[in-house]
Amino acid sequence: IELGAGNCEKARSLCLRLQPSEFVGIDISFDHLQEAMRGLEADLPWLHARALAADITQPIRLPDDLPQQRRLVFYPGSSIGNFEPAHAVQLLTQMRDMLGAPEDGGGLLIGIDLPKPVHVLQAAYDDAAGVTAAFNRNVLAHVNRLVGSDFVPDHWKHRAIFDSELSRIEMHLVALSNQHVRWPGGGREFLMGERIHTENSYKYSKEAFAAMLKQAGFSHLRSWTDEQGWFAVIHAWQ
């Protein structure tokens, strides 16, 4: 059961190794997900792949006929770090609930981005090529499409800040000049240097994340890290 499945490429590798009988990909975009399911079933003819359109931050009802035993919830990458800690624990609890009872033998396989030197984080979240900056400014273009505002993305500068106390990277957009932004029914003056806080990315130690898993009802875990200790994959079960 993959949350935020996208094109299912990570799940494809895992399915080749684990040989599951069923796969459920969950994502907000159903059409794209269905296409990925067809590709999975074409390449892995023994696999029954299903697409489920859902917002993973909301309660999810799995198919009624999905086998209860030995479910594996798969949440790769490190997206759990984009949620506030209390919300992350709620999501982990929801993942645990998908597994059924402890005797059903289910588990969670999840990735987390570990703490690392500040200069490494800064280079990743404020890269020289400007990829992250463009991604962050695109938030304003998206807001314009959604609500009809008139933000000019080029009038804002991307800034990434590491908060060592909270162990998180914060992404901000900083106004490059005084500007008035309008939207239907209102507007707002932004002064030069004023910031919009767009995103957080928490960097949990294995110990801190283990405590969160315990809060969510997981009793056992094992983990793997890369040689530098910058990323971890954790298998947790009840």
Roles of regions detected by a PLM:
Residues 44-58:
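Conserved SAM-binding strand-loop segment of SAM-dependent methyltransferases
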Residues 175, 226-238:
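Core SAM-dependent methyltransferase catalytic element
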Residues 120-216:
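Substrate-binding/catalytic lobe of Class I Rossmann-like enzymes that use SAM or dcSAM, i.e.
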Residues 97-115:
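Conserved beta-strand signature within the Rossmann-like core of class I S-adenosyl-L-methionine
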Residues 82-97:
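A short, conserved alpha-helix within the catalytic core of class I
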Residues 7-19:
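Conserved SAM-binding loop of SAM-dependent methyltransferases across substrates and taxa
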Residues 22-27:
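Conserved SAM-binding motif I beta-strand of class I
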Residues 29-31:
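Conserved SAM/SAH-binding beta-strand->alpha-helix loop
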